[in-house]
């Protein structure tokens, strides 16, 4: 493998055995591709905005004399970039401008004669844009739109599994689900009649819908039944015989022909009898006359002479009727063929319960069901029915729905109309009856072929269409009412409803979520999440076990491990690593094609439906060099089941061992040795890890770390290769390679880094360069690390030296004992940034004022504020300190004449304002790192605001001019090259000032042209610079768009440094979580024979019952990695020859059985080897991919190479006594995470505070500054102990005895420790509640 210069800095040893056939895809593509589809112009009009416009336009007026047509649309440029939107608290969006054409037709002239055409571009609101990382900035906060897994449109056949009716009879049903429009359900009742429901309303007999479709009883019977034909000849009754129909029946008479008896009366008819009848080719047999009684007529029989209806269709025949029919000349009688086995009389029975007889009565019945209480008219009833399923505006199956519909009914065509046809409805009913008759199967609704993914683009398009439909109504009315000569398209379109619909979706939809931004992994996982909840999905309460369960079709599409614990389990899932959606929105996963027993590298993506037809081998199946299967029998999956198949039956093979898991689960090394429940916790807890001060790559990883770090977008990645020309903490400049430049550009890429900004979870986002000056970089190399990344690899926690042993009860029940060294070295110190805002409003009594002149506040409290009343940057503040001084006008109080006089003399004004300053919340302390002031347009800016503005302008100018200098230098170096090659002497040129170079003329025409081009570029560059600077200045100096009534907002950013402390929650990656119980002095920790103490002591009892053995293997492998690092470190210290170093590192990389990774250190220069060694000396990072990781033997080999015992256990000594522990202890390096459940955020205490209004009891919870709840059970405990006085004060003065508690407070102040309990307020509430029931209770004094 070829490594780039940057990748050579640190190579992770990979234990993977299987070749990597397919690279890990870009992990955010599900979001980006979907949104791209939504906003890009689609000439076919299938997707996105184009599809929405085409479905609503053209809008015709009611009279048809004019119409508004859609031509095209374009998205403008966003006003602010992403960072500016976040700072200002606005939405990152672009204006949508649509070109519309108003066409007016002549009234009197023939149809289609155009009178007037007007075209105009109309503004249609703002469309939020997606950032490069797949998020949206809405009102200044980053949000993610989660994809939804919903039931695919189409037709589904299902049964109630015998749960509805008490008899346990299985009732079948069919449901036609459109993409938009009314649902149509067909269902059987316990009596086997078929009913229909529209939109889950009251059920009607199913034949009503057929009558409404203009079918008569005769036609209905013709559609659903086969016929039995009787003929009357010579007063004998003969029946046309189809022998097949007789199977399994009992003969009720002798079946004979020409005197030969085939079946005797009372015998069961078998296949042998049928073969005999068929052999003799018998078509007619004579039957007794009674046999026809009870059969059902298949059509109407009319007396030809009188026109009288003798026997209507669907009537049971009797002997009298037979005689009548015979008399009126009907010699051939058609009856329905039914039996109990597989030809039920369902439709015939349904017609009998159907109250309607013709189309009109059927339509009226449907109208009454849909609109109860409204009087039906023929026209209204017809319109309603037409609009339900046959109108393109109201009903749409969508392409997916039509595809699923046709596939379900086994039709060949995949495409078709979006509305239903008569044939569609009849075929669905026929298939449902077939299923009831025992032919065919019901569908599995949890199959991923019946559930599809709706991503951002599609949901945004639907919301946009909703907005457009609202506008459509208004436009129709304007077209009909307005004066068409003066009307322009602009006058008809109101952008408000459209932007309101879009804004509502992005701002408050259940699927638009506040981004989980704890660390890069939580961002990626959030964007790859798939939810079954949300509009048009399930609800938590109604979802049963089946929906939540792992389904065989999840394989390679949805992760079986990563899902939340609690009420949402199984409803919220995560996309598997390689999964993607196909054009219809179904999840598909890649497989390698197997041709003639050879596994090729040809990749096919299969959806769940297609996969069912193939035999698929697992990724860990053994292959030989040619790619043939080694074993004759191979474990494969087929039709959702796993079993052994011979190797020539195999059609496909999995692409990778980590194909079935999600990104989160694929980061857990030795996942294959963990119990699934613990793996679930491990995958979920990695998302809660807080980025530490210095990221530390995991010694034991899975090889996915780099992909996650790069794709998450928190790192700066080189867009093009080149050389590092300049680097500082906030900017990296790359001089681009010649071959990657675009013609006629300066060839400079500038990367500005994010410094100390706040994430959604208040953690710190900061980027640090990891390249040095002059280094070569290639496209895709990581230039700067973000939060929780180390040299471009995900690094959520720290490698800790752990020992598994009990330690004086400090690790009882999952507690964790931590060494003081961990705190001293700041291993788990994290930075949290809080944003505190102070809003100055315009009140009824006058404007609030931000000022340092606050009444009744001492000098000390104001010491950290400047003259504008805003805190200085860099000030250290603690709980209760004033950050922004603000005063609010108080209502005028009635003044006495004396006070009025004094006020007139001394101008004393302080008493009419009250202090409403922004203070630091209790229990928070930290450093102010930034202050921002936003002022409304037209309000005078204070001194601090002007200072900040000045500073921002300076910074912007500096940034831009530096950028200009860099680009200029690049240009001038090219001009220099052209001039020198054109014959100008270099020495003379060096003496000439740069800006005069362009005045020189060259004789070589080609060179002169090049020079002129470069000169043009130079002018353009300067012009561009001026433009950018002007735009920047305008943005900075313009007033801010604040909410109504707000004059000023001051935002203060407070950085809090939090060290690890008892009560913080920590976890490994295997679901092994615990709370820190004690920080132990270093000298007391257990240590080995060399005196190296351990960092963390974990309880060995946390392992066996939880079956997460992965943590033990990780610990051993981590020890080996560290051992090798220490050996390299020793060699570096002794300044060994590079050859020796190279040889040792090479041995470490080559270790293992047929490992796929090949590292050849002979291709590395000595400097590169030394730099690699520098980066390996703290431990050699190792990758052990999921299901394809290091084997026990390999771990032992590696331990041996590191000079460590292969058991992974060593002798420890007690740090307090120096005594040796009795047994050897497992010691090694485990990757530990600090989770975002910090004791500082949870611990809280209250003495006095706020009370609930009704009950007068203290509030609860930290946010309300509440008290401890002394609940029902605690009261029982005191009662049981007979602690009467304690109980009395708990229920009175400490809770809601209002007078008692104020008196008590006074007494304590006076030093008198007495208490007099009174009446608790909650007792009064109880009395009031009883009175509200009309029962009077009065308390009488004895």
From Swiss-Prot:
Q: What is its EC number?
A: 2.7.7.6
Record GO terms (molecular function): DNA binding; DNA-directed RNA polymerase activity; ribonucleoside binding
Q: List the InterPro entries.
A: DNA-dir_RNA_pol_bsu_ext_1_sf, DNA-dir_RNA_pol_bsu_external_1, DNA-dir_RNA_pol_su2, DNA-dir_RNAP_su2_dom, DNA-dir_RNAP_su2_hyb_sf, RNA_pol_bsu_bac, RNA_pol_bsu_CS, RNA_pol_bsu_protrusion
Recorded hits in Gene3D superfamilies, A to Z, give: 2.40.50.100, 2.40.50.150, 3.90.1100.10, 6.10.140.1670, DNA-directed RNA polymerase, beta subunit, external 1 domain (2.30.150.10), DNA-directed RNA polymerase, subunit 2, domain 6 (2.40.270.10), RNA polymerase alpha subunit dimerisation domain (3.90.1800.10), RNA polymerase Rpb2, domain 2 (3.90.1110.10)
Give the Pfam families listed for this entry: RNA_pol_Rpb2_1, RNA_pol_Rpb2_2, RNA_pol_Rpb2_3, RNA_pol_Rpb2_45, RNA_pol_Rpb2_6, RNA_pol_Rpb2_7
GO CC, any one term: DNA-directed RNA polymerase complex
Q: What class of enzyme is it?
A: transferase
What residue intervals traverse the membrane? none
Biological processes per GO annotation: DNA-templated transcription
Q: Which UniProt keywords apply?
A: DNA-directed RNA polymerase, Nucleotidyltransferase, Transcription, Transferase
* Cysteine disulfide partners in this protein: none
The catalysed reaction is: RNA(n) + a ribonucleoside 5'-triphosphate = RNA(n+1) + diphosphate
Subunit notes for this chain? The RNAP catalytic core consists of 2 alpha, 1 beta, 1 beta' and 1 omega subunit. When a sigma factor is associated with the core the holoenzyme is formed, which can initiate transcription.
What family is this?
Belongs to the RNA polymerase beta chain family.
Q: What does this gene product do?
A: DNA-dependent RNA polymerase catalyzes the transcription of DNA into RNA using the four ribonucleoside triphosphates as substrates.
Which protein are we looking at? DNA-directed RNA polymerase subunit beta
Q: Which organism is it from?
A: Enterobacter sp. (strain 638)
